[in-house]
Amino acid sequence: MITSSTERSASYLEKTAVVQNEHNGDLEISSPGGGPGTANMNPPESVGFSRGQQSLDHSVWYNGALMTFLATGEDTHGQFALIEAVGRRGSDAPPHIHHREDEIFYVLEGEIVFSVNDRTIKGTPGTMVFLPRDVRHSFTIESEQYRMLILVTPSGFEAWFREFGVPAPAMTLPPANEPAYGEVQRMLEAAPRYGLEFVLPQNP
């Protein structure tokens, strides 16, 4: 798992400190002026939503995967977006860099190999990978199918999947013969709007 400095962690959580208990691995959350187990929950409306089972209203087909938005920036006042991705072999992500948001990937099913700068991480069920912004990364699906959660903070990048995906007609995977990326040139042109940088192969 990739960790960041204390300073970056503080900025990620808007001055909420996250402390890893060295004795039992428990995660304690504290905020300025509060003890362990408390956190700054302002504005209070930001915790006042819930979402039930998966719905077509919140799902798209993107790059051979079914992407379901469990929470979006509209739900969380821009603090984070949570997405469930279900796909098959070939739903890979090319090398790229996010300049605006941090990502957390949590593998639920299947095997996914993450490349983070020059490091390789094998993700199996239960693996969590934290990717801070400005870090080059990609991933390759090694199993026939996979399922994972993607947390993006702050929110906003979920709009990319809506722009380049299509509304899912059913809670199923896209057809296996559907092209992975059908609008590559338009993606390259749109990337700067999302603070996204694709790392293209260098010419020999």
Model regions: which residues?
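A short, N-terminal "cap"/entry segment at the start of jelly-roll beta-barrel domains
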Residues: I2-T3, R8-F80, L173-P204
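Short acidic (Asp/Glu) patches
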Residues: G64-M67, G90-S91, P132-V135
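Structural motif
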Residues: L66, I104, E111-V113, T120, ...
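Short histidine-centered beta-strand/loop micro-motifs
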Residues: A71-T72, D92-H99, T140-E142
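A short hydrophobic beta-strand segment most commonly corresponding to one strand
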Residues: L82, F130-L131, S143-W160
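Short, conserved beta-strand element in jelly-roll/cupin
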Residues: L82-R89, I97-V116, L151-P154
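Short acidic-glycine-tyrosine-enriched beta hairpin
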Residues: D118-R136
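A hydrophobic, small-residue-rich beta->alpha segment in the mid-to-C-terminal subdomain
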Residues: R147, A159-P174
